[in-house]
């Protein structure tokens, strides 16, 4: 081929691939006064923000699309929507109408829903790429949930396939999994608040002891396994709690919420918010206390959050946040199957306590280099502790001997920073978006286990001198270093079809430096050996994860998407360093790896039905779990280690029917029916453990169903929700009933009915509801450690009433 031939072919190829760019500009004015309106967001209904009007109401942007549905949004005006042909829209004149001030609660809800449809995770949000990914967003205020107690069953009712531990009647900890992932403290998700990490240690101890107050959240963003490239390697993906933002129209707004409920529940949530010139702020205090629905389960919690922002100019903003949470909870202990069947709410542990002290801090810089290039820098840190105290034995039914208690203390000190640069550019005259980012994370953690007092109260001091021969004693320093570089690029093959490849490079160094005691006794209980064994370990690895996403959007109401991304989960400190009488740890335990796939369609049909229907596959290598083994002394025990290879696959769907639109009801009425279904199958495809291959995977109910009816008339709103979860196993050997430990065995199927009601009048709002209306006795969790071990029952029928006052 000659150079001339090559040039001709290249020119033809570029010509075939390219398409014209169109310049769109215009002015936005107020209909009554014809004056320009500044700070109006101009949205493409399918891809997000295109421009913002300046002080003269002017906006402009460039697009390759031939047709656009534009939405113009400002907090102080009614939303305006227009469809344009871009070839003939070089200059637009848009007028915004005044927003009616006395909106009913139904009208406010409809407006928030419309705004949400504009803001929901588009292809690009800030310095993040979501194109081609399975994404879900929870509008917390519209969930009609029991927010005072963070009722996850209600809050996440329209997120497909989530498996939730429901044993905490105050919502102090969030325990959610899904697709066969252990829900324990949400450890299989990367959990963030406003984009930064909040767990104890992202890799070494990814458990979330802190959960933001739901009353302070605007939305919860859930991105499935494809989030492994941008946010962290976990199989579950990302859960990002997005806090409420400062009120942009007032210098001061105060909201106070008072809640009373069953079993001595009392909570108060008070927030202050406002904007003055270049400064903005949002802060809240949340207090909770209660007796719990079981004996020996009282709790008290205090949580403070503060956000302060300073806007230097239209291109640069600096924000700082600080979060502090402290709570003390008495733990009633676990049950065996026989104990649960006898009395599901009994307790034989009066000396077990749990204490958390959590301090988070964050500093974020947002800078816009140009209309096409954005940069963010996030600095974050954690200074926290977690203390677990109590009488533990592998025989859950054993009466407390009132001897010394077991104490596990964990101190977590870490910091990190994450920087992101996102830019929009052209490839062969076609739109493209490139994201590059890096993250540095360093943790210095400490963990100690040993004897504590033989008293009753929450005394979190060790008593090693008094009980030198206590069996479970250890001390470990646990430093951890993680450096990662990640990138994704959206290539718009056409104005309807995009391809998004991505990568993540990870360097992980986890260390364990310390000792444990080896203590042996004779048949009479006399100590014959008390030795200290040094145990120093160093795990260092580096790897690259790859992923690919596809998206097809023929119009504003339909999208087909697909994604495949690799995942990785490193062994945690609790996997290797904690002595637990309920199970053994395999000495050969190692990291998990695999990949996640998603394929689905989502959209809206004539504003009557919104839907998200998809299939998924989750493929594991060296999955960690429990298996029943025969120990060297001939006893039957549970061992935690790498079980083998596994696959989970299924269908997830969410349909939301707008009955108001279907039956042509007036604007004073709101009526929606939703059905959220997940049908999953699973199998261990390979295992060296006897009797495991071909078994079902743990935490995989065959059917996960939630349905509900949301309605309202003017200022009155109501909700009724039904939830059903099929039976599931908790160990790889698929045990049906556990031994005296209660740790492994089946979690039976259960169903729950919840109702809630709210009424608004001027600055007041009254909310009330009943959870578990039918008073079903059920459990969702077999705890391997605290708050058990054993079966942890879920709450019986309970009520709550909340009064909200807004100033």
Name what the model sees in each region:
Residues 60-62, 196-224, 582:
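Short acidic/polar hinge/loop motifs at secondary-structure boundaries
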Residues 364-368, 374-390, 553, 559-565, ...:
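Membrane-embedded beta-barrel scaffold of Gram-negative outer-membrane proteins
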Residues 92-94, 211-255, 658, 806:
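A beta-strand signature from Gram-negative outer-membrane beta-barrel systems
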Residues 314-325, 356-395, 399-519, 551-553, ...:
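Face-selective signature of the C-terminal outer-membrane beta-barrel domain
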Residues 126-129, 136-200:
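Extracytoplasmic beta-strand/coil segments of soluble accessory domains associated
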Residues 313, 431-433, 439-441, 476-619, ...:
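Structural signature of Gram-negative outer-membrane beta-barrels, strongest in the C-terminal barrel
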Residues 421, 428, 495, 610-621, ...:
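Gram-negative outer-membrane beta-barrel transporters
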Residues 260-289, 294-330, 353-371, 440, ...:
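Transmembrane beta-barrel wall of Gram-negative outer-membrane proteins
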